A protein has these predicted regions:
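Conserved small/polar residues in nucleotide/adenosyl-binding loops
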Residues: 228-230
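Alpha-helix-loop-beta-strand connector modules within alpha/beta enzyme cores
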Residues: 202-220
Length: 230
């Protein structure tokens, strides 16, 4: 068990991965050494970022939580925290059924983990991430949530209404990532084509793509679309 080390385990989609990368940067800025997706606990603390979208994903998340609970009971881990979509949707039930977990967080309040560790969220690193992808590419999350009401999909229940990120903030992040060697951007959201409708009252994905493409150093852009709606 390594002191001052935190293990981050990410389950689910690339949007979850971006959240983990942001948390990792905040933890590192507060002096922690962070490992990602380790098979076994290495540090004193573990944070599991869960998925709660479909049955298989829920099962995988529960099994991972129980595996780390066992490690905690065996003295291989001091603290265990859980965040992400599963705990956003079932926080009360999980806290009741798995009391070995020190605290459950939702998908959007993971910054409270820093306070519970006696640390502070550093706003100057708000758009910074510790990349876990190969150095030449990164995921770029441009919005959260979804306004569609598809009967088969739980995403709106978990993540809420569609919320676009400000375009200037996204471009600043692209420039920062390019300065770190990123050449390819994989643009992600639950519904890419809704980008801008809430902030700018019209669909702004084409304009956003053009602005990203015009940033010096950007060589490739990929769109991860859930639905075509332009």
């Amino acid at each position: 068990m390594k002191r001052n080390t935190i293990d981050i385990i990410t389950l689910g989609c690339s949007k979850n991965l971006v959240d983990s990368e942001k948390l990792m940067r905040q933890l590192e800025a507060n002096g922690y050494k962070v490992t990602h997706d380790s098979d076994k606990p290495q540090g004193e603390i573990a944070v599991i970022n869960t998925c709660g979208f479909i049955g298989d994903a829920k099962e995988e998340s529960i099994n991972m939580i129980l595996e780390f609970c066992q490690a905690k009971e065996e003295g291989k881990l001091k603290k265990l925290y859980v965040m992400g979509c599963l705990s956003e949707r079932y926080l009360k039930e999980l806290a009741l059924e798995i009391p070995q977990v020190d605290k459950f967080y939702g998908k959007f309040n993971w910054n409270e983990l820093l306070a519970d560790l006696g640390k502070a969220y550093k706003s100057e690193f708000a758009i910074e991430r510790t990349l876990t992808t190969p150095h030449h590419y990164a995921y770029l999350k441009i919005s959260e949530g979804c306004d569609r009401k598809c009967s088969y999909c739980a995403i709106p229940i978990i993540t809420g209404r569609h919320i676009s990120r400000p375009m200037e903030e996204i471009i600043d992040e692209v420039k920062l990532l390019v300065s770190e060697g990123v050449k390819e951007f994989q643009i992600i959201a639950q519904e890419l084509t809704y980008y801008g409708v809430d902030l700018y009252k019209s669909q702004k994905l084409p304009e956003l793509i053009e602005r990203i493409a015009n940033v010096p150093g950007v060589e490739w852009i990929r769109l991860h679309l859930s639905l075509i709606h332009i």
